Amino acid sequence: MKMSNKKRNADKKPLMYIVQPDYAETTRSSMQEIVIKRKADKPAPPKAEEKPAYHEKQQEEAVAQDVLQEDQKPAAEPVSQQTQEAREPENIKSQEEQKAEPQAVEETVEHEPPKAEKKEEPALEARKPEKEPEAVHSADKAEEKAPPARKVKKPMSKMTIHEKIDFLTKLPHNMPRALCLIEANGRTYRGVIVGRRNDSVLLRTTGNGAPTELAIDDITSLHPLGF
């Protein structure tokens, strides 16, 4: 019976198939119960634990950059030292030039004043003669512009003998001569003063004779009549 069943099954199988072993039907008695206890899944680690790894990477990168910078610094320092050494003589020269400039200026200032004084002296001497004529002209102009002093008219009674003689001798010709009473050398004269000659007065008396000459210093009193 078993052989016939196998042949039948072989006849029914397709050309392409997966060979499977023949096995007997299992009964419950032949089965074993196997209990498998699954372990509880551990909770995922918090993200905070992952951060240290990230930070560690950053720190490693920063350390690597610092190392590179330190390696580059020694190469750059000689260059900077060379530039500083090259600049030091230039700075020293510039400082020396700056110090020399004020000294030169001070020397020029110290030497210049005597020249200026020497130049000013002839200039003043040349100007002096120019100013003197100007002063003369200004004085002349002032005299021309100055108004003539007004003569104060005195009454005849307050005039001196000299003032009376000047007044009577300078009267206009169209005015009549005043008759005067003159005392000189102890004598009294009555007449008209015609003129003046040096320090003497020409007096014409009432007579028709020549005028009498009297010294002004000898006249003790002079009284014009009619004033």
UniProtKB/Swiss-Prot annotation:
Region described as Disordered: spans on this chain: 1-157
Alphabetical UniProt keywords: Sporulation
Basic residues compositional bias, start-end: 1-10
GO terms, biological process: sporulation resulting in formation of a cellular spore
Residue ranges with Basic and acidic residues bias: 35-60, 85-100, 108-147
Keyword Ubl conjugation: no
Domain of life: Bacteria
Transmembrane intervals: none
Localization per record: Spore coat
Membrane in keyword set: no
Matching InterPro entries: Spore_coat_CotO (IPR025439)
Note, other: Largely but not entirely controlled by CotE.
Function: Has an important morphogenetic role. Involved in the assembly of at least five coat proteins, including CotB, CotG, CotS, CotSA and CotW. Required for appearance of a morphologically normal outer coat. To a large degree, CotO and CotH act at a late stage of coat assembly from within the outer coat to direct maturation of this structure.
Name recorded for this polypeptide: Spore coat protein O
